[in-house]
């Protein structure tokens, strides 16, 4: 055997050497093999029987009897012993096993379309395909290929029994050429029924191929993926065979014995062998015969398929090898100066095909295609060859002065007279190295094409000789000239050549220009905005420079200050203290004030001037413009706010504290000596108080007229602004005093110049005129001051207001008021309307006539018309249009046909019934006037009634006073109460009290806000959704919105639809009041439709897409969202989350898992997927040995494959090969069949199967426990309840709308009804709160129990997962360290084949602890775990149902209470609105009754109408009900008591902490007893203190713990009260405050508890310290015994000892008491926890409360008004 193996290796080496020789002689190719070998995981089938569960299938046999059926179970890989019924796709790979026909691949029953796909890792050359079927061959199929890893597919060939039917568009028959796609019927017949083959040859040998390397042929024979699509099964017709129809599909399926895909590694003729691809296992891990995909390239080629040349082998183009032409790649020729090159086809063609390699990165200063010439700046050494590394010498030329930057002559040429290394100078350069400028030139430069430049000095700016610096070229310039050529002026000068010194100064304005720099050409300075002129001293058109007094603040617009000035005196009997006095200009006299006029200020009063328009931080002088009315001086006190300074301003004295100044009576302006500093963007206020220091009787009524307050900027506060000379001129000419005066001003030139400059500086330019377009003549204004040219009677700097005594500013100016001197109170009128202030009975714009109803201007009197006329002649007083049937100048008598005395107040009444007897409208027998009552009594005819027979009887209408209008029945379309005498007018027939929401003269129309048919009594309220209609369509106050009176359709906002405008249109969502809906904006490519969820805007995404707009890939999908999202093809059990890369789709395997789909265990791990435990440590050793052997065998297999076609050349070896084959077969038989029969493992296998079934059942039960599948039903129920609540909410909205339109009587009734409902609901909620809290605590306890049981179940599951039976021998080896396939005696423990004393097999019991015993124990544990989990499942489900029921009921109760609270609030608001309407109605009635000239019959009618109003309940009861509601709404205030109580408890805990610290301090004193004997006397005192402290400490601890418990209870109560308060009121701020207080109380309670624990800890420390005290006392006693103390001292010491021992005993007793208290507290906690057991009793109460609340809610929903 060893000899044969050596022979194999020797022959393999010979074959390899021969293959290398073949590559040297021409084209060479790798051997062809089966591409399926070693690619089990890359072979996939779309359908396999029994993958998810065992599946029955039948075969066509026993035609006369019952058909024969079998089971397919492919959940585990095929194993001849354990899994013989597994028919996965990897069974079709040829393995040369003896019993080959016992395994095959089989599809699911009855499927026509099934595909098999092979995914290769690289591009392979495909030869042919052979399929061997177990069943009938397919009736139709096709074979496809892909060369781009499955992105695009091409068909190889179609196969079908009936090509015309299966593939109608495909040509059938023989192919006419290579690669023709045809349909072949040769391999699709029904015979044979088994063992039939389908063969596909890529290149038909019947066709001659001229160029096998053409792109067409190469594309035909290469592939990366192969797909076989079965499209139709052969069916034989069950009716003919008498089969049952219900299982006819069980016998039709695809079954395949073998699949051979012959091919080789594709290497373009440049390799004879291949190796595994990168990132794949090498030969040591590959099965024998596997065809690898990475070429081992020859001929200087490279790449996976040898598709390119190696680096530096680029001299010729790459070509595939063909026959004897190897077309090897040639190396480049670079003269030893480069190791890199590339191929250039243009160079190759230009050389005639000799050389195409271009060298890269030439070294040694060389360049060129072959690095055969020197680089620029170098030249060739004639004494050295070009391949010499020092052949190129650098040039010695100045690069700045030579042509081409220092390049010299590269080589000598006698013909041209050039010498190698010679420099080539530029035109203006000279020298051997070209490093000098020629005369009268300068500046040798590399950028200058001439090398040097001529001097070129400007004659206007330079001295009269043309020379310059050789290096810089600088010419010699005049005084104010600069530049290299003296061609420009220096900064601050302009006009080259126009001045003796070369240039003129700029002279820019110091304020109008930014600097003193100007244009050197024209001298234009850089002006600030809106400033013009060469020197920037003129404003632009429409702009001006502000004067000194520009910042004026009118006293009339200032705020009056309340109170007296600090330095002023009181003023009595004068009010108000400040009064505005308008100044009226006198023609011909100058105006001495600004603004409308003055502010008349009394002594002690003040004015506040608001200053917020400061443009620049600067010091200002305050100027006050005033006029005194007496010879006495006044005093002002000034306060500036805010007073603080900043980086720009330093606080002045005036700004730091109030200052007083005198206002002389002889002047009209006062400039305060102390300046103030103001800056921009600050709101200042300047308070000015006025007073008279010497106020006597003669000045009691004195006052001062204040015009304005001005701020004058100080020029000296501007830094670096002007020179000292300018400041001197400014002060010399008194610029400030002149510019501050009122009236026309004539400024000196120096003042005007400096003021203009300062204005431009402060305002950063000129200020806009802003002349009023109607009040001014034009848009321009004065250069300094900005005064616009005003039209007549128009004043103001901008001409924007009328002068005093005029009005109506327009294009014509203003009009004078012309108020009548007798009719008006003043000569000044309103400046907008022109209305003069008239006296009481005077009217008219000018107050020049009497009011209506008055006469005799200017002494206007009321018209004397006896109240029967309103108007009279304004001059004579004669009455117009007398009423009441009166006549005369003063309406003092009755007209003809009436009687009465108007002068005495008796109205005129007709003595008619109703007309006079001579007319046709007389409906009485007679008429008379009662002398006592003065009543006119008519005796009416039949059919008429009334005092004057002027009315129809009840049930009739008409107007007897009009001819032809008899009384008729009221026609109101059945929409009135016919028994009501006031339901319609008996005179006109007009319907007055329409019912059923109707209106109109005949009740024929629906009311506004209603729709339907009034004739059919179907008028209904418009149900428009308030958010979906335009607010213009809904009346204010909550009334019904308008809708179509017939259909009820509401006017919807944009993109809103529905009859009630209650939903968004398709493709829109988010209904917003007043704006409508917004677009869904769903991605049309990835969403199912353009519609989206109307609440969330979520678009309905297609499968695989997510995001709100479906613009993202869904989790567990990958790809490009705009293009395509592909599901991750990964095994979830073997992946992490997310399971694949979102961009590439590559599966993310967890540790220990591998495979493209993460569906198998990685090498080095057990193959029990998905657990994949790491193998034993010995695995690595064996794996190395097996890999070495596998590699050797694989080499032999390749050798055998190469020698397969050369068997005829080695006849002498045929016998040896035959012997070797026999030996190999024998070895395979021995390896596959163990030394003992398989029947010995049957009993073990049965236990294995039983345990596995138990594990599967337990897994299913655990899934049920963990997943709570019935939660889905709970969620569905919750959704249904939410839908019902939504419907109820809509009903409540409709109810609210009806309530808002109800009458006061209905609202009162509803308030009473809803109050009872809300009171009942509030009571139920209060009762429910404790139940809900108890339920929540119980639910938490149950969840704790559930977690405990779950952890136990997880532990059982983990134990079960450890029970695995991969293989009997491997399992025994892992358990006992030995495979167990030998007798039991030498083993450390019993194996799988243990025997007893009598030789019988023993597989359990003592001494046999192998896999069988382990399986038996595992089965027993699994059964126990199964029972535990079943009980756990029942308990968990019962508890979960109870928790969900209670939770749902509590949630429903909470929601119902919230709804009731909201309804009650709405009704309360409605009642308030109705109350306001009633008050308004009562006010109107009172005003009506108080009016004069109201007829008595109208008053009587109104009184009767008011008396007819009846409330449903007495007013006192209604008031009581409203008071109760208000009391309930104020319940939140009661929580303040709880807050105070908790604060007191916290204070008590803090005091207790102080006492505990005092006790600690007292205990520390005891520690110093060892210092002196005298301190022992303090022990007794300390003992007393300690006793009292511990006693108090114990009591305080008990009290604190009680307080803690009480605080916790109050906290829980406050939480429930907070929830109740939140239901009663919508005041979110109040709730937030209460929650903050609650959190503070909780913190206090926690702190108190912590302090109590700290006090207990201190008591324990006190005990320890006392023990230490005893020790120190003992030490001290020993010391005293040695020193010999006196008897007295020893007695005192003994007393102290006894006292200390007593103190210790007392301390220990108190510690025990504290311990007992702690135990009691724990017992109380346990008792509180036990109360949770009352949940079962409370459940019934919660259900009853819920039902009652639901019933009340239903009753409330039916309470429509």
From Swiss-Prot:
GO biological process assignments: cell adhesion
Positions of the UniProt region annotated as Domain I: 1409-1761
Keyword Endoplasmic reticulum in record: no
GO cellular component: basement membrane; extracellular region
Laminin N-terminal domain: residues covered: 24-264
Covalent S-S links between cysteines: 265-274, 267-295, 297-306, 309-329, 332-341, 334-359, 362-371, 374-392, 395-408, 397-423, 425-434, 437-452, 455-468, 457-475, 477-486, 489-503, 506-518, 508-525, 527-536, 769-781, 771-788, 790-799, 802-814, 817-829, 819-836, 838-847, 850-860, 863-872, 865-879, 882-891, 894-908, 913-938, 940-949, 952-967, 970-984, 972-991, 994-1003, 1006-1019, 1022-1043, 1024-1050, 1052-1061, 1064-1077, 1080-1092, 1082-1099, 1101-1110, 1113-1125, 1128-1140, 1130-1147, 1149-1158, 1161-1172
Domain Laminin IV type B residues, every copy: 545-763
Compartmental location: Secreted, Extracellular space, Extracellular matrix, Basement membrane
Laminin EGF-like domain mapped to chain residues: 265-331, 332-394, 395-454, 455-505, 506-552, 769-816, 817-862, 863-910, 911-969, 970-1021, 1022-1079, 1080-1127, 1128-1174
Keyword Calcium: no
Keywords: Basement membrane, Cell adhesion, Coiled coil, Disulfide bond, Extracellular matrix, Glycoprotein, Laminin EGF-like domain, Repeat, Secreted, Signal
Domain of life where this protein originates: Eukaryota
Coiled coil stretches, renumbered: 1243-1301, 1416-1480, 1525-1759
Signal peptide bounds: 1-19
Region Domain alpha, residue ranges: 1376-1408
Glycan-carrying positions: 169, 229, 246, 1016, 1055, 1223, 1301, 1326, 1333, 1354, 1469, 1517, 1587, 1596, 1609, 1725
Annotated spans, Domain II: 1175-1375
Domain topic, free-text comment: The alpha-helical domains I and II are thought to interact with other laminin chains to form a coiled coil structure.
Assembly and interaction partners: Laminin is a complex glycoprotein, consisting of three different polypeptide chains (alpha, beta, gamma), which are bound to each other by disulfide bonds into a cross-shaped molecule comprising one long and three short arms with globules at each end.
Function: Binding to cells via a high affinity receptor, laminin is thought to mediate the attachment, migration and organization of cells into tissues during embryonic development by interacting with other extracellular matrix components.
Name of the protein in question: Laminin subunit beta-4
Originating species: Homo sapiens (Human)
Name of the gene encoding the protein in the UniProt record: LAMB4
């Amino acid at each position: 055997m060893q000899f044969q193996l050596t022979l194999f290796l020797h022959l393999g080496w010979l074959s390899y050497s021969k293959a290398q020789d073949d590559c040297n002689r021409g084209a060479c190719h790798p051997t062809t093999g089966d591409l399926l070998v070693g690619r089990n995981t890359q072979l996939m089938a779309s359908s396999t029987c029994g993958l998810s569960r065992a599946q029955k299938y039948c075969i066509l046999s026993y035609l006369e009897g019952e058909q024969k059926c079998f089971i397919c179970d492919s959940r585990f890989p095929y194993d001849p012993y354990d899994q013989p019924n597994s028919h996965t796709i990897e069974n079709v790979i040829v393995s040369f096993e003896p019993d080959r026909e016992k395994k095959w691949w089989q599809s699911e029953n009855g499927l026509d379309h099934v595909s098999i796909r092979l995914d290769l890792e690289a591009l392979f050359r495909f030869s042919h395909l052979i399929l061997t079927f177990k069943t009938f061959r397919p009736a139709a199929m096709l074979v496809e290929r892909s060369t781009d890893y499955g992105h695009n597919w091409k068909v190889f060939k179609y196969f079908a029994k009936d090509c015309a039917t299966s593939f109608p568009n495909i040509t059938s028959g023989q192919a006419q050429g290579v690669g023709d796609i045809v349909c072949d019927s040769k391999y699709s017949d029904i015979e044979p029924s088994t063992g039939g083959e389908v063969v596909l040859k890529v290149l038909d040998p019947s066709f001659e191929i001229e160029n096998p390397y053409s792109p067409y042929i190469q594309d035909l024979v290469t592939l990366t993926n192969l797909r076989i699509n079965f499209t139709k099964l052969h069916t034989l017709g069950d009716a003919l065979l008498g089969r049952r129809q219900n299982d006819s599909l069980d016998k039709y399926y695809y079954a395949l014995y073998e699949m051979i895909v012959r091919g080789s590694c594709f290497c373009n003729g440049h390799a004879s062998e291949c190796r595994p691809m990168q990132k794949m296992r090498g030969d040591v891990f590959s099965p024998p015969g596997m065809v690898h995909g990475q070429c081992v390239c020859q001929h200087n080629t490279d790449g996976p398929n040898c598709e390119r040349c190696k680096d530096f082998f680029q001299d010729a183009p790459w070509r595939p090898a063909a026959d004897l032409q190897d077309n090897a790649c040639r190396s480049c020729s670079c003269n030893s100066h480069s190791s890199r090159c590339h191929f250039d086809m243009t160079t190759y063609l230009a050389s005639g095909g000799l050389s195409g390699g271009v060298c890269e990165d030439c070294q040694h200063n060389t360049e060129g295609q072959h690095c055969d010439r020197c680089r620029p700046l170098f030249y060739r050494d004639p004494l050295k060859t070009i391949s010499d590394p020092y052949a190129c010498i650098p040039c010695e030329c100045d690069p700045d002065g030579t042509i081409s930057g220092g390049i010299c002559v590269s080589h000598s040429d006698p013909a041209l007279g050039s010498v190698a290394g010679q420099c080539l100078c530029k035109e203006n350069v000279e020298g051997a190295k070209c490093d000098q400028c020629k005369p009268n030139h300068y500046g040798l430069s590399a950028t200058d094409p001439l090398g040097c430049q001529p001097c070129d000095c400007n004659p206007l700016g330079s001295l009269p000789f043309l020379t310059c610096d050789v290096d810089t070229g600088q010419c010699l310039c005049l005084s104010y000239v600069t530049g290299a050529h003296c061609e420009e002026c220096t900064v601050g000068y302009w006009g080259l050549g126009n001045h003796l010194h070369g240039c003129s100064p700029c002279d820019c304005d110091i304020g109008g220009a930014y600097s003193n720099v100007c244009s050197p050409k024209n001298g234009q300075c850089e002006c600030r905005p809106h400033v013009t002129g060469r020197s920037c001293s003129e404003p632009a058109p429409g702009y001006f420079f502000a004067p000194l007094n520009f910042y004026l603040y009118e006293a009339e617009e200032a705020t009056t200050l309340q109170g007296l000035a600090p330095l002023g005196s009181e003023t009595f009997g004068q009010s108000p203290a400040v009064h505005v006095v308008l100044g009226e200009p006198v023609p011909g006299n100058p105006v001495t004030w600004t603004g409308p006029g003055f502010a008349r200020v009394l002594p002690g009063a003040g004015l506040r001037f608001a200053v917020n328009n400061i443009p620049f931080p600067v010091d200002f002088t305050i100027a006050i413009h005033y006029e005194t009315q007496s010879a006495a001086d006044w005093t002002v006190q000034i306060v500036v706010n805010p007073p603080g300074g900043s980086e720009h301003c330093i606080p002045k004295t005036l700004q730091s504290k109030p200052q007083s100044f005198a206002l002389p009576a002889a002047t009209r302006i006062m400039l305060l000596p102390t300046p103030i500093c103001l800056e921009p963007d600050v709101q200042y206020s300047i308070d000015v108080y006025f007073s008279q220091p010497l106020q006597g009787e003669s000045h009691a009524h004195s006052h001062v007229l204040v015009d304005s307050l001005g701020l004058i900027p100080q020029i000296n506060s501007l830094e670096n602004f002007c020179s000292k000379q300018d400041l001197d001129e400014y002060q010399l000419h008194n610029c400030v005093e002149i510019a501050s005066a009122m009236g026309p001003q004539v400024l000196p030139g120096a003042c005007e110049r400096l003021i203009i400059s300062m204005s431009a500086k402060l305002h950063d330019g000129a200020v806009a005129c802003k002349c009023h377009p109607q009040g001014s003549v034009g848009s321009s204004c004065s250069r300094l001051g900005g005064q616009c040219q005003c039209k007549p009677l128009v004043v103001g700097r901008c001409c924007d207001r009328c002068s005093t005594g005029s009005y109506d500013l327009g294009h014509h100016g203003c009009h004078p008021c012309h108020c009548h001197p007798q009719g008006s109170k003043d000569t000044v009128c309103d400046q907008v309307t022109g209305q003069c202030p008239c006296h009481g009975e005077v009217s008219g714009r000018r107050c020049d006539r009497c009011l209506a109803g008055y006469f005799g201007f200017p002494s206007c009197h009321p018209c004397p018309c006896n109240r029967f006329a309103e108007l009279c002649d304004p001059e004579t007083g004669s009455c117009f249009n007398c009423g009441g049937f009166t006549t005369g100048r003063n309406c003092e008598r009755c007209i003809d046909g009436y009687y009465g005395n108007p002068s005495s107040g008796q109205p005129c009444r007709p003595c008619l019934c109703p007309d006079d007897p001579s007319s046709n409208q007389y409906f009485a027998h007679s008429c008379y006037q009662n002398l006592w009552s003065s009543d006119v009594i008519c005796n009416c005819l039949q059919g008429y009634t009334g005092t004057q027979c002027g009315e129809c009887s009840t049930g009739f209408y008409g107007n007897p006073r009009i001819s032809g209008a008899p009384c008729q029945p009221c026609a109101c379309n059945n929409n009135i109460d016919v028994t009501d005498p006031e339901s319609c007018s008996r005179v006109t027939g007009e319907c007055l009290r329409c019912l059923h929401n109707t209106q109109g003269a005949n009740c024929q129309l629906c009311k506004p806000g209603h729709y339907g048919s009034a004739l059919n009594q179907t008028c209904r309220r418009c149900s428009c959704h308030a958010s979906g209609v335009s607010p213009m369509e809904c009346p204010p106050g909550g009334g019904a919105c308008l809708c179509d009176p017939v259909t009820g359709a509401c006017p919807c906002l944009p993109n809103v639809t529905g009859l009630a405008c209650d939903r968004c249109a398709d493709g829109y969502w988010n209904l917003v009041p007043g704006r409508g809906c917004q677009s869904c904006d769903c991605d049309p490519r990835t969403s199912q439709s353009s519609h989206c969820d109307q609440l969330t805007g979520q678009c309905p995404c297609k499968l695989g897409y997510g995001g709100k707009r479906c613009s993202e890939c869904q989790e567990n999908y990958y790809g490009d969202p705009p293009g395509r999202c592909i599901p991750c093809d990964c095994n979830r059990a073997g992946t992490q989350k997310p399971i694949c890369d979102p961009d590439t789709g590559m599966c993310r395997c967890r540790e220990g898992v591998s495979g493209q789909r993460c569906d198998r265990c990685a090498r080095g791990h057990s193959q029990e997927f998905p657990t994949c435990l790491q193998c034993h440590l010995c695995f690595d050793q064996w794996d190395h040995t097996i890999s070495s052997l596998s590699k050797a065998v694989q080499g032999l297999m390749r050798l055998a494959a190469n020698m397969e076609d050369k068997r005829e050349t080695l006849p002498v070896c045929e016998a040896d090969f035959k012997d070797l084959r026999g030996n190999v077969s024998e070895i395979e038989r021995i390896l596959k069949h163990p030394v003992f029969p398989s029947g010995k493992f049957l009993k073990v296998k049965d236990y294995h199967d039983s345990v596995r079934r138990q594990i599967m059942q337990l897994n299913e039960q655990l899934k049920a426990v963990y997943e709570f599948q019935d939660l889905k039903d709970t969620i569905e129920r919750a959704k249904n309840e939410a839908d019902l609540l939504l419907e109820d909410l809509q009903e409540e909205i409709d109810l609210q709308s009806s309530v808002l339109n109800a009458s006061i009587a209905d609202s009162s009734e509803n308030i009473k009804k809803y109050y009872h409902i809300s009171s009942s609901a509030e009571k139920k909620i209060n009762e429910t709160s404790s139940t809900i809290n108890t339920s929540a605590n119980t639910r938490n306890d149950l969840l704790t129990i559930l977690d405990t049981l779950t952890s136990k179940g997880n532990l059982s599951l983990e134990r079960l997962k450890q029970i695995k039976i991969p293989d009997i021998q491997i399992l025994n080896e892992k358990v006992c360290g030995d495979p167990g396939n030998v007798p039991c005696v030498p083993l450390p423990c019993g194996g799988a084949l243990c025997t007893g004393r009598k030789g019988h097999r023993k597989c359990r019991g003592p001494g046999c602890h192998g896999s069988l015993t382990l399986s038996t124990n595992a089965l027993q544990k699994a059964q126990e775990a199964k029972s535990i989990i079943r009980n756990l499942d029942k308990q968990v489900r019962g508890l979960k149902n109870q928790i969900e029921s209670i939770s749902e009921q509590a949630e429903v109760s909470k929601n119902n209470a919230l709804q009731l609270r909201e309804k009650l609030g709405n009704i309360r608001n409605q009642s308030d609105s109705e109350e306001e309407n009633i008050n308004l109605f009562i006010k109107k009635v009172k005003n009506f009754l108080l009016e004069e000239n109201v007829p008595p019959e109208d008053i009587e009618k109104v009184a009767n109408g008011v008396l007819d109003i009846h409330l449903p309940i007495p007013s006192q009861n209604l008031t009581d009900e409203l008071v109760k509601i208000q009391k309930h709404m104020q319940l939140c205030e009661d929580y303040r008591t709880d807050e105070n109580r908790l604060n007191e408890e916290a204070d008590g805990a803090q005091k207790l902490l102080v006492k505990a610290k005092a006790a600690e301090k007292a205990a520390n004193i005891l520690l110093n007893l060892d210092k002196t004997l005298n301190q022992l006397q303090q022990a007794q005192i300390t003992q007393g203190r300690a006793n009292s402290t511990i006693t108090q400490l114990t009591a305080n601890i008990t009290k604190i713990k009680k307080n803690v418990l009480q605080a916790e209870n109050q906290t829980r109560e406050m939480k429930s009260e907070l929830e109740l308060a939140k239901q009663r009121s919508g005041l979110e701020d109040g709730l937030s405050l209460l929650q903050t207080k609650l959190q503070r109380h909780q913190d206090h309670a926690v702190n108190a508890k912590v302090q109590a624990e700290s006090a207990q800890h201190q008591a324990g420390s006190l005990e320890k310290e006392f023990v230490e005290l005893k020790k120190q006392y003992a030490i001290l006693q020993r010391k005293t015994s040695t020193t010999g103390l006196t008897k007295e001292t020893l007695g005192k010491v003994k007393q102290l000892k006894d006292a200390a021992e007593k103190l210790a005993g007392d301390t220990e007793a108190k510690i025990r008491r504290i311990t007992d208290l702690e135990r009691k507290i724990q017992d109380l906690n346990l008792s509180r926890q036990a109360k949770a057991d009352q949940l079962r009793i409370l459940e019934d109460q919660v259900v009853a409360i819920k039902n009652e609340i639901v019933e009340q809610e239903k009753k409330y929903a039916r309470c429509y008004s």
